[in-house]
Structure formats: C-alpha cells, structure tokens
A protein has these predicted regions:
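Phosphate-binding chemistry for phosphorylated carbohydrates and sugar-nucleotides
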Residues: 2-213
Length: 213
C-alpha cells in the first residue's frame, strides 16, 4: 500500500526484486489523494484487525487489508504454506506497518514500525550482519519493549527527539565526531586544528539552537 504518495515509484521498482513472490500493489494514484482511505493512519494503535471490521467504517476502504484477507483465505483453502503479508506506508514513506494474515483465526495481525525494526535487527543478528554494541536509534515515542528487545540483542540503545531531522542529525553528529577524532590522531597541522575547532563551535551552536544551517 503506497498510500497514493511519494513511494509509488520506489514500490514499483522493488517489485522487480521480490523473486517468486506474488505482489499486489495498491493505492498508487496521486489523483486519489495521499493518505485518503489508505496508508497507516487508520492502523495506528491497532494490533489486531478482525475480518468483520473490514466491512465497517473506516476499514471498509482499506484496499490493502481487504486484499490481504482475500489472498490469505485463498491460500488457506489451498493449504498453502506461504505467508500473506503486506507493507503499508504513509504518504511520505517515513512510516511502515506490516499486516500479516493469521490463518488460524482468520484475522490480520498488525506489526508496527517498532516491531518491524526488531524483526530486522533479529534477522541481521541471525545472519551475523551485526556486531556487539551496534547502535539502535529510536525516538521518545518508540515502544519501550522495542528498546528492551534491542538491549537484549546486544545493541546500544539511544533515544532522540521525534522527527526525521533529529535521527539524521544524530547520525551526522556521530559520524562527524568519529572522523574528527580520527583526523586529530593522524594530522598535525595548526591550520587544520583551527578548522576543526571552528566546526566544533558551529555544531555546538546548532545543538543549542536546535537549528540547521
């Protein structure tokens, strides 16, 4: 579910990389209105969607969930072992939920962004693509359970303020500090030292003012 928004072309490109999966792409028209009767908005705070809810407001317009229910039931009748899952974004693509069909109870389980992050983390760890002390960054609105799970997986958990710019800012600042220390230990030049000092002062001012130049 591209929420009739910014990720439409990205989703269309991703489909080519899904191998043998049967992919259904929906809500891909800007003319129908971004986030209108689609996307994650109506899924906020939900963990379970019962089948009968899809015939009532507001979820009766949720095309992605309806298609997941239909496909899940079809696979259940065929005794198929394949999973029926979805990816539901919001209009600008910075949030993603994963609805999963539960064939045992004929319902849809909603995995939110925090849950998805932990699933990705556990997959990376299982495939030895993480290291001890790996940074796990989330916001003050994130689930405490997600932070506990990340700590249990051996990550260093850091919280930041809400919003994309703060996550990017935190990543930028950490990268800058690492490079700064590296160059200090490898370059002995007065002019270069003055430049680093000016940069440090600029970063400090930006942090104090919560602004970006």
């Amino acid at each position: 579910d591209a929420a009739n928004g910014a990720f439409i072309p990205v989703f269309k490109q991703m489909i080519q990389e899904f191998g043998g999966a049967n992919v259904i792409l929906c809500n891909t028209s800007l003319e129908n209105g971004i986030n209108h009767n689609c996307g994650v908005a109506d899924l906020e705070g939900r963990h379970i969607v019962e089948a009968n809810e899809l015939s009532q407001e507001p979820l009766c317009h949720a095309e992605a969930l309806i298609r997941i229910l239909e496909e899940g039931r079809r696979k259940r009748e065929q005794n198929s072992e394949g999973l029926t899952v979805g990816l539901v974004l919001d209009g600008d693509g910075d949030r993603c939920f994963m609805p999963v069909y539960d064939p045992q109870k004929d319902r849809i389980i909603i995995i939110d962004g925090d849950g998805l992050a932990i699933l990705q983390l556990l997959w990376l760890k299982q495939n030895q693509k993480t290291r001890e002390g790996q940074l796990y960054l989330n916001t003050v609105e994130s689930s405490l359970e997600a932070s506990r799970s990340a700590l249990k997986a051996g990550c260093f958990v850091k919280q930041c303020a809400v919003g994309d710019k703060w996550i990017l800012w935190d990543a930028l600042l950490k990268a800058y500090k690492w490079k700064c220390n590296f160059f200090r230990n490898h370059i002995n030049d007065p002019e270069f030292s003055r430049m680093l000092l000016n940069l440090e002062n600029s970063f400090k001012n930006m942090e104090e003012q919560s602004s970006f130049d």
